[in-house]
Amino acid sequence: MFDITRKCVEWGDRLLVIESGKIARQADGAVVVDYGGTSVLSTVVSQKSKEPVDFLPLTVQFLAKSYAIGRIPGGFFKREGKPSDRETLISRLVDRSIRPLFPTGFCDEIVIVCNLLSYDQVSPPETVALIGAAAALAISGIPFPTPIAGAKIGYIREEERYILNPSAEELARSELDMFYSGTKSSVVMVESEASELSEEEMLGAVTFGHENCAQVLDLIEEFAEAAGPKDVVEFVPHDIGKVVSDISSGYSEKFSVAYSDHNKKPECSSLMPPGKACTQICAGKHVEESGEYTEQEVLLAIKTFERSLVRARVLDTLKRVDGRGFDQIRNIEIEVDLIPRSHGSALFTRGDTQALVITALGTPQDEQVVDGFDGDRRERFLLHYNFPSYAVGEAAALRPPGRREIGHGKLAWRAIHPVLPTKADFPYTIRVVSEITESDGSSSMATVCGASLALMDTGVPLKSSVAGIAMGLIKEGDRYAVLSDIIGDEDYLGDMDFKVAGTKDGITALQMDMKIRGIGFDIIEKSLQQAKDGRLFIIGKMDKVIKESREGVRDHVPRMESMIIDKNKIKNVIGTGGKNVREICEKTGVKIEISQDGTVMIYAVSRDAVEEAKNMIMCIVSEPEVGKVFSGVISEIAKYGAFVSFLGGRRGLVHISEIKNEHIGSVSDVLAVDDKVKVLVIGIDKDHVQLSMRRVDQDSGDLLEHESYSSNKKNGPQFGDASGGASGFRDYASGPARERRRSGGSGGRPVRRRSAGSSGSGSGGCYSVPQHVGTPDPVHGNDRRRGSGPQHASGGGGNKKPRFF
């Protein structure tokens, strides 16, 4: 029933298997590629374009379902939603690798779907997906003249060793994360992040990838020959020679004027690139006037003529479209700290390309939780790239970020990420947003420069300034020119888009896309060296504006402070059902994170809020101490007094004689359950805490003035007044350890003897307040009230992971 073709090879330390003829047999081409424990089903389907176009309508979609890692999707619907950024980036890698290899002028619609069936989290899925797409194209009958293969490359600098398709563990130690793709004769696409590697080390990685892909290319050819392609689609390029000749004779002057003076844009919007404007004008007029050519033929002819005109001008006159030399950078203007309430901002303008980059700092609670097929993780550095239509003078509705925006944002992220401080040194979550306000090429590299400037303006301690530059290529036969800092027309009409970002010490990100069938290593080497010169020039311009990160962050940046509490007190801080910690957050406006080891992180916009929250937490975790005043709440009424809950769950007794400085008939006459009170600790006997209300001002929480013992011949020793207050407190006067009578009210009453614990004096019948009570406290400050109210805690327990509130 199944006509199965299967080929395999030992590649690296794993077995690579390509198989077809069993699954998805209705597709033009379908293969299953296994590499280690990673498996991808790649399918290809083609059909004639519904409308005339002058480009290749190729769509590549990489899909990663949860079953590939043995999981059920979360959420209510329990199925996958829109593609993740990781899936989108892999789709772009495959697209950018195979697109240049199709014949010029081939405009059939092609859809390639790469479905991740299994993932062992060791073998990279992007490698398997590209090999699968190339193998499926090889047996589909679609014109695809040469196979392509790709590999992920790592590098251990200490060992000077490159790694083929590194595992996650190896990648964590690697100073390079590169994806390479190419044919037997040339390099087609490169994407990488690096820890300031040299140009020689990066070129070595590309060479290593090229050498190791050779056996995979042989395997694809062997597999295609064994499987036997379906009927090959005969592709005959359009004969557009006459159309090109007509365009040249009728409109060459307009194009020459447009490209000889880049600032002069005839018959077009002042913001539209000249070539694109002329194309629109010529296409419309020529189709109407001639009547013998289709719109697709005219568009292709115009593009062919335009390319030949510009390329000949560059190679013959050694001058570019805008008159610059090959290695000349456009004029650069830089401004920082221009958005008042942002945490940091920068405006980077290079020629007609401009990026407004703004930063915002947040707490660890603002980290992005990424739930992907690579595993769950938290991301503390976010970089978002936005490209509105007004940046190129077009009237179009704003839409959510597409593949291009996601890809450009990720490239800038790769460039900045290696120079960021560690979380231990700078615990903030960092978000950078790049708003492209003008674009004429290299907007992603303007984002890199603007992001570096904005982060330094924010106060993020970067290791070094980071700059990026886009290189271009014009190649005709053996003649070629490498162009620095390309503009939009040079990107559109050129053969290469080679973006390099890094510091003075090395490369942090590299991306190379080709529009021809690859280039040799000599051109790559020259491009890297020329890019280094341009990068250093741009960093010099940036350093003149801001060379180092600012000291500290702005006042309106969220504040973060930590404190350590006893692990056994965690449950007290959290409270029953989170009652206590929730009350602290609501009252002060802070966010609190509690770790299992007793570390408490407090986040707030203002320092005052942080201090207030710290005071409330200290109030909960502190142990009762004789002479200290605390806030509490009445939890129980008894005939002989009232029980008060304080310090997040501790209970103490206020004897009826310690409620007021006057006689009361019943406790319930003056107190009720849930009343908020201020109490003074006057005695501790093991776990029994004795409290007093009458000695504390119930409004301010301060000790009452003139509160002391005095001797009375008639009634014996009595409580009288003693001086006190913010300046400090003295010991209460000592007396015989017998019954005492207290003055005040309508007469004296017997007072029960109490133990003052270690704070008692003499015979132990008197209470003492330590001299330091009432003086400024290094934790609580002078404000004894703290505005805390009751703090109940009777459960919650420690947590295995940090708890966020």
Curated annotation (Swiss-Prot):
GO terms for biological process: mRNA catabolic process. It comes from the Bacteria. This is Polyribonucleotide nucleotidyltransferase. The gene is pnp. Residues 558-617 form the KH domain. It comes from Anaplasma marginale (strain Florida). GO terms for molecular function: 3'-5'-RNA exonuclease activity; magnesium ion binding; polyribonucleotide nucleotidyltransferase activity; RNA binding. It is found in: Cytoplasm. Keywords: Cytoplasm, Magnesium, Metal-binding, Nucleotidyltransferase, RNA-binding, Transferase.
